[in-house]
Amino acid sequence: MSGCEGPVGPVGPAGSQGTQGSAGPVGNDGNDGNANVTVISLKKADINWVSGSYLGRTSNVYELGAPEVNQDILDHGTVLGYCLISSDWMPLPFIWENTTGSSRQYILYNYSLEKIKLFAYQTSGVLNPGSVSEYRFMLITDNTVTSGRISSVESVQDRLNDAGVDISNYFEVCQYFGIDPN
């Protein structure tokens, strides 16, 4: 038997809500991110040293315009500096003494709002740090509330120290924050 098709009928009422399913398994913790870290790289070829002074000592000075060093970094963070000598990343400040102890070489830095300054000198005068091929600065902010008794720099450094990170080791800091060290 065959029949004719008629028009589609009206939509029926919605069904009742089904029962809640069981909870799924707990997921694994994700990797810590590096949202609070900015890395600034500075190649030797990009540095134009000028004569200046550091704490009254004649030195070579380079000032890097760095808008990334903002008020948040100054209020809640720190800037860690490193220099690449041969194939080794060394922490800043970097102090090298020759084998006889008659001369020391210094490469230092400081930072303020929107700038990072490098200083280079030696006991005998101005230093041209030609053996440094690159500088890297890690701007780290810690937005956790700190008491008025410790600075934001101490807060960041304490957090890294508590995690077993040696801040003088460039690779450990990169690994902690999930940053490609190259």
Regions found by a protein language model. Give the residues of each.
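Extracellular or exported targeting regions of proteins
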Residues: 36-182
